[in-house]
Amino acid sequence: MAIIAITEQQLSLAAAFHIRARLVSRFGARLGRLWRFPSAERLAGASLQELSSCGLSRRKAEYVKGLAERVTHGLLDFDVLKQQSDDRIREQLLAARGFGEWSVEYMLARGFGRADALPSSDVGLRRVVGHYFGRGRRLSPGQLERALAPFKPFRGLAAYYLAVHWRLRRSVERTPG
């Protein structure tokens, strides 16, 4: 999930999915018709040029490689980390190059299953929640937190369901007939 967090930073989901698919097909292991996500060892051994050829910017390629190296050298252990408090996870992830607040909240929610984790700086999420709670206007990070406060300790989960509903609704609206 940490590599996925890096690939999704400041990109549309479509662009991030495309990059991830290229990473997986280039460095992952084929399992019949499916692919296994690349191991940390495989990504750590890749050159920056090879990683960039999958669509990553040079900086993101450095982040992916650096993160993979931290994992392979035992400096970052996600199995141990998931047992820690949210604050301890934040501290450890922010120490890794390429991780900011958005990536940490993403990892807390998707990587560690913390239902209250909320990436309040996410522009798309602020737009979606603003549609439902802000009279159609994109919310500020503070407004997003206040709008979802009644859902605590499940703010991240509530935001996820709102985003899914938003996407499904838009998909139906675009479907002819």
Residue spans for each PLM region:
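HhH-family (HhH-GPD) DNA N-glycosylase catalytic core used in base-excision repair
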Residues: 1-177
